[in-house]
Amino acid sequence: KKIETFANDQGHLSPWVTWPTIHRGINNEKHTIGFFGQNLEEIDNEFPPLWNILRASNIDVGMFGSLHSYPLPKELNNFKFYVPDTFANGPECFPKNISYFQDFNLKMVDVSNRNVQSKLPIKEALKFSMNFYKLGISNKTIFDITSQIFKEKAIKERVVRRRSLQAQISFDIFYKNLLTFKPTYSTFFTNHVASAQHRYWLAKYPNDYKNILYDDSWIEKYNHEIDYAMQTADKF
C-alpha cells in the first residue's frame, strides 16, 4: 500500500518549519517561521500557538519543550508550568526553579551543538544537581546519570547517548509538574529520537544506501543508537 505524505508548507521539509505549522494551524507562507532566534512577537499576536490560544480561553496549560516557545509569555496566568525548547536564547522558565535545569540544558546544547561532546559546564551542573529532588529527578535517573559518566570513560562513543539522557531528565521534571499542577492540557516535546534517526539511520539500515561513506566499524559502533533512543522514550 502506498502511503503519501501531504503538507502545505513550501520549501524544504524541516522540523523548525513544520512544528510551527502544527502549533498554529497555518502554513509557513503565513507564519514565516524558519529558524531559531526569530522575533516572534508579531507572529504570536497574529497567529498564536495552541498553548496561547488555550491560555487566553481560560484553559490551564502545562507546556514543556515545544519548538519556538521562547521567550516566556508576558501573560503567565493559566500556565501551570512553561519550559521553552532546548534552543532557547535564555534559561527563563515557569516556575522559576526549573531554570536551574534549563540553564544547564542550554549550556550542554551550546557545548555539543551538532555533535555531542564529553565536556560538562561544571558551574551549571553543580547548581542543577543541588536541586535534583526539588525538580523531580528520580533515583533511577540519578543512577543512569552516574552510569552514563562511567560508560563514557570505558566506551567513548557512548557519549552520544547523552541526548537520550537529556530527554529522560526532562521528562522527570515534566512529570513532577504534571502531577503537582494537573493542567487540563499539557505537552512534552523531545527531539532525541529524531536526532538519532538523522545521524544513525545508515548505521541501522545500511542496505538502504547504494553508496556508503562510512566503514564497517562505524556502522557497528552506532547501529543500536536509534533503538536505544526509542527504548528510552518507551520508558518514560
Task: Specify the residue positions occupied by each region the protein language model found.
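Metal-dependent active-site segment of extracytoplasmic phospho-/sulfohydrolases and closely related
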Residues: 1, 228-236
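Short, structured active-site-proximal loop/turn typified by the sulfatase FGly-forming signature C/S-X-P-X-R
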Residues: 1-18, 60-64
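Membrane-interface transmembrane-helix boundary segments in multi-pass integral membrane proteins
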Residues: 219-229
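His/Asp/Glu-rich, glycine-adjacent segments
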Residues: 25-219
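Generic alpha-helix structural propensity
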Residues: 13-18, 45, 49, 169, ...
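A short beta-strand-to-alpha-helix junction
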Residues: 42-45, 227-231
